[in-house]
């Protein structure tokens, strides 16, 4: 039997420059699976009729953007072009979710925006969206590696304007000229395209 190899010690010390990150970003297929899980939209099956033609807008967008989405999990390799592609895919998934009304069966997106986003209606819209994105609800224990429901809800639906801080996203959008469907899609896309769904 041969002798065991001699182990050689090293004086190598890891530095911040040589350590790899404990976090990364999801790759293109993970982003797609996450968006499908949050919105309830089946990318391949979702279809609409446009001028008598059947089109598959979510799948077409994904196939078009696939090479522009992150291919590796390294946060250092994340580019601004990745964020643009992520935003486009998030908007397409949210468009399908609102039009198909997959996770908000009790809500009517034809309601006037002032009524739709008032009081309890606002929470009926954001609660399932945020809960699916961060993995817990306003009344359950948060996942320590995720932003809290309260933080995401504040940014999207409840923070008032204070000092230099702007109002929450919904209030800013309701004050503009967009209708309920457009606002809902924008809010949905802001949650989907955020670090809450992309960082792992």
Which ranges hold each PLM region?
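Composition-driven recognition of low-complexity segments enriched
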Residues: 1-200
